[in-house]
Regions:
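Short beta-strand scaffold segments in enzyme catalytic cores
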Residues: 314-316, 332-336, 365, 443-452, ...
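Active-site beta-loop-alpha substructure in enzyme catalytic cores
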Residues: 124, 266-280, 358-432
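Residue-level detector of high-confidence beta-strand sites
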Residues: 342-348, 408, 455-461
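A short, polar/charged loop-to-alpha-helix boundary motif
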Residues: 350-363, 459-475
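Membrane-embedded alpha-helical bundles of multi-pass enzymes
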Residues: 2-233, 414-415, 425-428, 432, ...
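Soluble catalytic regions of membrane-associated enzymes that act on cell-envelope
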Residues: 209, 226-357, 372-378, 390
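Structural detector of well-ordered beta-strand residues that form the stable sheet scaffold
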Residues: 311-313, 385, 437
Length: 546
């Protein structure tokens, strides 16, 4: 029944399928399988539409279907703003246009099956670099990509997007040939293969087919899935040479009492100081109204650090009091405090839209901290860095050294957004092959250790302590992504498209005539043994060969 509707009313059926599949695929936490199915429908639909009458009207109908599905998938989120419906509608309009544009562009770029995956991955790489929310909103899977997650340290999310585009290309070709019945194949005069089918108006359409590229693309997808079965994403063993266990804590006190937030965080930090080496406060844990309040609070944190030997990540919100265009705005920051005072300061580089906060322009740095216990007189150093909130939605790889631990204070307004941001942090940890201490301070937030095989998660408030393993000294094994960024992924994606287009010079190599072949001695001997001996003619007396 469904196939008959598709054959007799293909455009209407495709619009309905587009709306339903976009709702399932463009959820706040996109999964790979629904996204591939939705993208294959969109790829097939746009390829059939662009060569027919009323192309623009048909594309507007497709965009409307995507917008409806995208809007209802995000309608429950608040985005940290009271103008929730307006923000949701704006998000749906922008990203539905961005996604549809690149699919339509690929439909006009010919029949090379490698073009669409390359365009798809490159497009979302550019959007992530330009968007104020990074990869939030990108049509890219956040879950369900474990089979190809080993690619992320080498080509980042660019490789996962290429896998999604290639899978959608293969699936759309399979549906076109074997489900919809557009598989009447003939040979052109030049020997190339073509496929004939009729459109809705009854006009015969001829489309070139190259099933060899599709099969090769399918072979690449299958081959790239094998390495995941050979690797295990597990934490490092605790008791091995050159490894030390480090206690990390996310401080999430109960703020319903009469105490101020700063005192509550200080008391909770003192409770876990005997078990943790590093304690992190969530994003905007305290508010410093003046510079004097900030200095006083950091001095108290330094005294606590000196007393217990713990490093404290104090996350705060402060107003900008300097004269200028940013006066009156705020900024989020995290200060790493040790026994000797402030060791490093980090400020949010990508604040949430409509939050009226000032972004930091400089990249996060790395600080070396000395860990150990006084009673054992055994100390070691560990490299540490930090980023705040939406910074983890933006890929970054340019560190002078590999950090062994990244502090990740955050604060989200919805359970789904908490899951999204924690998955973003997991992707950044996989790219850098490091561990992130994720600490979300909202009532419905998630916190835990992500990366390096860690899977600990906690929902809502409640201070916790977890042990992680650090290699001492750290192994400086730089990945391709850390060395070259997205360049290696771009090279691999576009090489099958660009290389066949390069004209090669007509070079003819002339070889000298080969030497005369030596006699086949074995063959001659075999002939001599098998031939019959000559006999003498009795009449003439001569030898005769028989």
């Amino acid at each position: 029944m469904i196939l008959q509707l598709v054959r007799f009313y293909p455009f209407g059926a495709f619009v309905v399928f587009t709306a339903l599949s976009s709702y399932l695929a463009l959820q706040p936490l996109p999964s790979s399988v629904p996204l591939i199915a939705f993208l294959s429908i969109l790829r097939l639909e746009t390829t059939l539409v662009i060569h027919r009458p009323w192309t623009f009207v048909r594309l507007v109908a497709i965009w409307a279907a995507i917008f409806i599905g995208c809007f209802f998938s995000f309608v429950g989120l608040r985005f940290g703003s009271p103008e929730a419906p307006v923000v949701t509608a704006s998000y749906a309009v922008i990203f539905s246009l961005l996604g549809l544009f690149i699919v339509v562009l690929a439909a006009y770029c010919g029949s090379n099956n490698f073009v669409f995956p390359a365009l798809w991955a490159t497009w979302w790489l550019v959007i992530a670099q330009m968007s104020p929310v990074g990869r939030l909103g990108a049509w890219s899977p956040l879950i369900g990509d474990d089979t190809y997650s080993w690619l992320r340290p080498h080509v980042s999310d660019f490789g996962i997007d290429w896998i999604v585009g290639a899978s959608a290309e293969v699936l759309s070709c399979f549906v076109t040939w074997h489900v919809l019945g557009f598989n009447q194949r003939h040979q052109n005069d030049d020997g190339n293969e073509r496929r004939d089918h009729r459109n809705e108006e009854g006009d015969l359409q001829t489309e070139r087919v190259d099933s060899g590229r599709v099969k090769f693309l399918l072979f690449i997808l299958i081959a790239l899935s094998f390495p995941s079965s050979l690797t295990e994403l597990l934490p490092e063993p605790l008791h091995e040479d050159n490894r030390h266990d480090v206690g990390v804590s996310c401080v999430l006190p109960d703020l319903s009492g009469p105490r101020t937030s700063f005192d509550a965080f200080m008391n909770e930090t003192a409770i876990v100081a005997g078990r943790a080496h590093v304690a992190l406060w969530p994003e905007d844990a305290v508010f410093f109204e003046t510079e004097q309040d900030k200095e006083t609070g950091l001095i108290k944190a330094q005294e606590l650090s000196h007393q217990y030997g713990i490093f404290i990540g104090v996350s705060f919100l402060e107003p900008l009091l300097e004269e200028g265009e940013d006066r009156g705005k705020r900024r989020s920051g995290t200060v790493l405090v040790g026994k000797d005072g402030v060791m490093a300061e980090y400020y949010g580089r990508h604040p949430a839209p409509f939050s009226k906060r000032v972004p930091e322009r400089s990249l996060p740095g790395i600080v070396n901290i000395t860990l150990g216990r006084k009673n054992t007189k055994h100390f070691w150093e560990m490299r540490l860095s930090a980023s705040i909130g939406l910074d983890f939605a933006h890929p970054y790889s340019h560190f002078d050294a590999k950090p062994q631990l990244i502090l990740g204070p955050a604060r989200t307004d919805h359970r789904k957004m908490a899951q999204v941001m924690m998955e973003m942090a997991r992707h950044r940890a996989q790219e850098l092959r490091t561990t992130i201490l994720w600490c979300d301070g909202s009532d419905s937030g998630l916190s835990g250790l992500v990366g390096s095989g860690h899977t600990r998660k906690q929902v809502g408030p409640g201070t916790w302590v977890e042990r992680m393993v650090a290699r001492i000294p750290s192994e400086e094994e730089w990945t391709l992504y850390e060395l070259y960024g997205a360049f290696f992924g771009l090279l691999c994606a576009w090489a099958p498209i660009v290389l066949p287009m390069i004209p090669l010079p007509d070079i003819r190599i002339t070889f000298p005539d080969p030497k005369p072949r030596r006699a086949n001695v074995a063959g001659r001997l075999n002939w001599l043994l098998r031939r019959k001996r000559p006999q003498r003619d009795v009449r003439t007396g001569t030898l005769v060969e028989i």
